[in-house]
């Protein structure tokens, strides 16, 4: 069989928006480079799973913890931009967050008409990325931007550690039946340490990893095209 082993090119190959119209996402949202915090945060529990009596207190605590991050000295002067990944699932959490924060915000809802490439480019030009989905963590890394990488699964944690970026890693245990197979909340002392790491780092470490992975992805893309031909 004609099977080719390759690195994953999903994240590492730039979209047209990232290479040619890199600031179009900022123009659409009326943002300035480095003047916004990008949030990619999910509702931890599925709609058919969430039970206010069972999960309500943990959900409220998560909102409190995320709000505390927003008021961190490095973030509080910037606009908060919320990017839903699973729209119907994430919008409820986002609306609860903006109501709680009382800070300037932009929600990347369907009316903003951002392309996939423009959404990816948002990770590049932010002041800080707060990522709680695997794809958002990868988009941040591939755009050379450090962030608060909140992992709720071994998969995400292992990838972050493999890349040598555990200085940005925080973990969150959603449920006993999957992922880390235990429930635990955000360690805010750890979050504050990560925040200090982000804003004291010269970013050379993450930029080196970004460059290496983009090179690998480019080679893999060429190999894929040859293989398809």
Residue ranges and their predicted role:
Residues 1-229:
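Active-site anion-handling motifs in enzyme catalytic cores
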């Amino acid at each position: 069989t004609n099977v080719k082993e390759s690195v994953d090119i999903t994240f590492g190959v730039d979209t047209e928006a990232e290479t040619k119209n890199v600031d179009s996402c900022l123009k659409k949202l009326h943002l300035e480079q480095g003047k916004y915090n990008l949030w990619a945060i999910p509702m931890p529990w599925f709609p058919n799973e969430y039970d206010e009596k069972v999960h309500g207190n943990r959900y409220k605590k998560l909102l409190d913890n995320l709000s505390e991050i927003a008021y961190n000295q490095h973030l509080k002067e910037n606009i908060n931009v919320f990017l839903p990944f699973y729209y119907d699932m994430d919008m409820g959490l986002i609306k609860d967050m903006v109501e709680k924060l009382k800070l300037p915000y932009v929600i990347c809802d369907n009316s903003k008409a951002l392309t996939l490439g423009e959404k990816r480019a948002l990770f590049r030009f932010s002041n800080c990325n707060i990522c709680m989905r695997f794809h958002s963590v990868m988009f941040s890394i591939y755009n050379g931007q450090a962030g608060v990488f909140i992992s709720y699964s071994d998969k995400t944690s292992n990838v972050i550690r493999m890349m040598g970026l555990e200085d940005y890693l925080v973990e969150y245990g959603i449920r006993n039946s999957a992922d880390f197979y235990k429930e635990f909340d955000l360690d805010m002392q750890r979050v504050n340490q990560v925040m200090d790491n982000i804003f004291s780092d010269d970013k050379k470490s993450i930029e080196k990893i970004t460059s290496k992975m983009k090179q690998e992805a480019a080679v893999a893309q060429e190999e894929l095209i040859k293989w398809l031909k």
